[in-house]
Amino acid sequence: MPGTTPISKAPYRMAPAELKELKEQIQDLLDKGFIRPSFSPWGAPILFVKKKDGTMRLCIDYREINKVTIKNKYPLPRIDELLDQLQGAGFFSKIDLRSGYHQLRVREEDVPKTAFRSRYGHYEFLVMPFGLTNAPAAFMDLMNRVFSEYLDKFVIIFIDDILIFSGTKEEHEHHLRFALQRLREKSLFALDG
């Protein structure tokens, strides 16, 4: 992407209900410190995708910036190898991180490239937004570093999923406690439940 002319696209048209939702979600992102007002020459449009539960997911259309981004070739594990590791395990827990990607900070020099435009203003992300081509690789790399010594022993990472597996209930309770403690130490937070 070095030397690329900044890419900026006009906002997409939105229905009145989407505009109301957009205003609320932008305010929520501002309140959480995930975004800030921007003067960046970059700017991607926004759209909403309806989730299974009927709520609206705010999506930034980063397709144009993704076309000029140098792809991180982080190796994804083979599914069959991951499944082989589960042999003999009888207890499993999947950990979801609360706003997973949003727990990763964007390097200050890259923040302007995350900019998005709306009728309510121009903003940029301070945390990793969904939709950037390298977001899954960056997140998986972080999780692999957090759990490096326990990978393939009782932790499997696949993109943004953390799977804890154990042979016995007692082992599993210990492994789960350890995994949650490790996340806490790294200031990463799991969803309750």
List PLM regions with ranges.
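Retroelement reverse transcriptase polymerase core
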Residues: 1-193
